[in-house]
Each structure stands twice: as structure tokens, then as C-alpha cells.
From Swiss-Prot:
Residues 1-29 form the signal peptide. The active site is at E241. InterPro entries: Kelch-typ_b-propeller, NANM, NanM_proteobact. Keywords: Carbohydrate metabolism, Isomerase, Kelch repeat, Periplasm, Repeat, Signal. It is found in: Periplasm. The lineage of its organism: Bacteria, Pseudomonadati, Pseudomonadota, Gammaproteobacteria, Enterobacterales. It catalyses: N-acetyl-alpha-neuraminate = N-acetyl-beta-neuraminate. Kelch repeats lie at residues 51-95, 97-149, 151-186, 187-232, 235-284, 306-355, 357-386. It holds the Pfam family NANM. This is N-acetylneuraminate epimerase. It comes from the Bacteria. Its main location: periplasm. GO terms for molecular function: racemase and epimerase activity, acting on carbohydrates and derivatives. Converts alpha-N-acetylneuranimic acid (Neu5Ac) to the beta-anomer, accelerating the equilibrium between the alpha- and beta-anomers. Probably facilitates sialidase-negative bacteria to compete successfully for limited amounts of extracellular Neu5Ac, which is likely taken up in the beta-anomer. In addition, the rapid removal of sialic acid from solution might be advantageous to the bacterium to damp down host responses.
Amino acid sequence: MGMQMKNFKKMMTLMALCLSVAITTSGYATTLPDIPEPLKNGTGAIDNNGVIYVGLGTAGTSWYKIDLKKQHKDWERIKSFPGGAREQSVSVFLNDELYVFGGVGKKNSESPLQVYSDVYKYSPVKNTWQKVDTISPVGLTGHTGVKLNETMVLITGGVNEHIFDKYFIDIAAAAADESEKNKVIYNYFNKPAKDYFFNKIVFIYNAKENTWKNAGELPGAGTAGSSSVMENNFLMLINGELKPGLRTDVIYRAMWDNDKLTWLKNSQLPPSPGEQQQEGLAGAFSGYSHGVLLVGGGANFPGAKQNYTNGKFYSHEGINKKWRDEVYGLVNGHWQYMGKMKQPLGYGVSVSYGDEVFLIGGENAKGKPVSSVTSFTMRDGNLLIK
């Protein structure tokens, strides 16, 4: 009887959440056309005039922009990126120019993948790209970044450049020998999280001075593939990988004040309905709408966390990757399950404008890039998806 009552209470709680934040479609939200080409593992940012820029990833060196203030909204192609095709870059607008940090790619068709530490900037006025005379203190792939003000960006997380590059060098060397290749793969994944040395240093780049500053370290392990947002000087660093295949459900929170980062109490993303624990997400979409932080999509390996807890370092071995469609919201200081997206999706671009969060491109459950653009908006306690 006690178990029945417990299950009944859980069911009623879930029903209450669904009633208070029911998903719907609405004319309130802005409808944007599809991107001209499918985009996953790309990057994007919005300027102070409401113009969104997206590119790289599966779009190669292509970049596109769309003006949200125009009555008739269409994507326009801008000058191609000169730094070569790459994925997992981070971009922000600083001093009215689009800055692109790092990424991963190949120098040529014969070379293995490698982590980049370069920086480029784009002038919307001149429609020109320029390589900035700087390199990041560490290689930047799987990192995340948020704009602090008009001249500074905070960048943290990401893989260890040397370990990551060595893996792809070894894979390339063993390409003709399947047995040797499998050995390289196993040896790479079969290590504890600490042995990957993911970056946990927080860097501040100042575009005006073209300088980098060490702003301390994350309060816990370094991550890759995290989502990050900044609102009212509060930074939220959401989940990510602790090592390849293993996510964390932890959300780091910090306050940026007087050029100093102060870490606050962590929180955790709740489990999805019907699941015992939250595996954590990599490649999730995120943004604020009417004071509610929304987190949706991403991907994980269900069961990897338990395997790792049980001592299996190659924690996602034999587990199929799962793209997620759940949406969570931080409502009045508490995380809640809000409902589902139109389809499972991750590794796209999140851009906020007003109280709308645009989800641009991404990777679907088949691992394919998509060109769709959807949006999250909170309205009268309801989550609107369009």
C-alpha cells in the first residue's frame, strides 16, 4: 500500500508539472526559415542589432546571417570563413565584430583531426574576416564561452589538446589494421575521467586589449560539450562530458562581479520521467525566457554512469548513443521537467533574442545534421515550442 501511495504521489506531481507548463504551439513565437544547409557541430552568435550569424560545422566554411528585425526574414550568405572547415568552435560578438575561437578540423585532406587554438574575427560592416594576432592558452575544442560585456568573453572547459590529437594520430596510423585500430580505440576510452585532463581553467579574453587572463578554476571536474548561459551577471555551466561517453548532471553556477568570478552552490538536472537517474547531457540547447532557464535536447549514453560507478572505465562500451528530446526549466530556483521537443536533437546552435530561445540546426537521432529552426518561449507559465 505504501509503494502504491508513493507511485500515486509521483504520478500526481508529474501531472501537476505537465499542467502548469504544458507544451503548445503559438502565434506568439517567431517563425524562422530553415538554414540554407544542414548544420551540426557549428557555432553562432547574435549581434546587438538582432542579427543572428551561424556557420562552420557541417556547413564547412560557410556562414549565414538573418535579421530578426526585418518583416521578411531570410538567411543571407556572408563571406566564407578563411580558417578552414572546423567543428565545435565558440563564437561571440565583441566590439560589434564576430569572434570565433578554436575548434577541431584537418589542415588538409591527408592530415588527422587536430585541436585549434586560433582566433578569427568578422566585420559585418566590411564583410571581411581577419585572423587575430593571438592564440588561446590551451587548445579549444569542446569548450564553451559566454559574453561578459562588449569587450570580454569567458571561455572554459574542453578536451586536452595533446591527448585528443594523439588519439587521432594513432587512429590514422592504424587505419589499415583493424585489430590495431580497435586496440587504439579501447585504450583511449578505457581510462578514468581524471586521465583525460579536460580543461578546468576559466579564461577571460579581452578583445580591446587582445589579452588572455586566468580567472581561476571550475569548482569541480573539467567538462567538454557543456552548454553555458549568462543572465544578469550569473553564469550557468550546464552538464557536459567528464570523459568521452560519460556525462555529468551537475550544473555549475557563478556570479561575475567587479571582474571576479565567485562560484555558488551547484545544482543537478533531474531525471527524465521513467528514468532512475539523470545521465547528464552533452550538446544541449539552452537559454532564458521570462526568467526561466530552459535546457533541452543533447545526447548521452543511458547506463554509462552506472557502468563507471561499477568500475568500468570504458563506460559507454556497447551502449547506443541516445539523442534526447526532453526540456527542463529552472523555475523559481528549482529544476523541473517541462515536456518534449518536436524531435530528439543536439549539437546545434542556441541563440537568445528577447524572451525567445532559437534552436538552430543540430543532429537528429540518426546522427544526421538538420536545417530546421525552432524556438522555446515561456508564456503565462507555459512552454511554447514553435
